[in-house]
């Protein structure tokens, strides 16, 4: 059953493909997740696909490939992600230098502390904070940072909010 939540064919991947397909309007990403799940079985503690489900699995793999090319690796998406990384880095720098920067509690842990992958995996505090975080934490902070006195932080935040992306 571990393979249902952590594999190349896990329910999270099926969910985000359908969700991302819906919200971006890219129909090629839509998959029949219900049908795929009905076609799965467990044999000798391994997840297997019934013969009649092979076509649905092929569609899933094709949909993932198409979504990568049309959405995830699209120049606009990559640019917005780069800007988001710069915003977070700048906020982290300001916090580290003692500057007052608004941040939600869950997001703040990751901006105020230097956390290695080992720390993240071994300390339940970080996993708990991560699971408490969602898009609202990030976007809420960016909206507040858009009026921050630091021009770099505020300008890039405003640009991302207004979808004026780097060229």
Label for each model-derived stretch:
Residues 1-167:
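Histidine-centered, transition-metal-coordinating active-site segments
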């Amino acid at each position: 059953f571990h393979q249902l939540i952590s594999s190349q064919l896990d329910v999270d991947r099926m969910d985000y493909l359908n969700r991302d397909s819906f919200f971006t309007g890219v129909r090629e990403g839509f998959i029949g997740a219900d049908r795929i799940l009905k076609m799965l079985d467990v044999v000798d503690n391994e997840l297997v696909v019934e013969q009649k489900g092979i076509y649905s699995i092929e569609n899933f793999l094709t949909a993932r490939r198409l979504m990568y090319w049309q959405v995830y690796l699209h120049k606009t998406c990559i640019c917005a992600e780069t800007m988001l990384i710069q915003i977070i880095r700048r906020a982290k720098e300001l916090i580290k230098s003692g500057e007052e920067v608004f941040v939600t509690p869950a997001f703040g842990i990751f901006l105020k502390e230097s956390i290695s992958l080992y720390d993240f995996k071994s300390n339940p505090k970080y996993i708990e904070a991560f699971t408490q975080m969602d898009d609202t934490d990030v976007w809420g902070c960016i909206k507040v940072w858009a009026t921050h006195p630091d021009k770099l932080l505020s300008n890039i935040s405003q640009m991302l909010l207004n979808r004026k992306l780097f060229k």
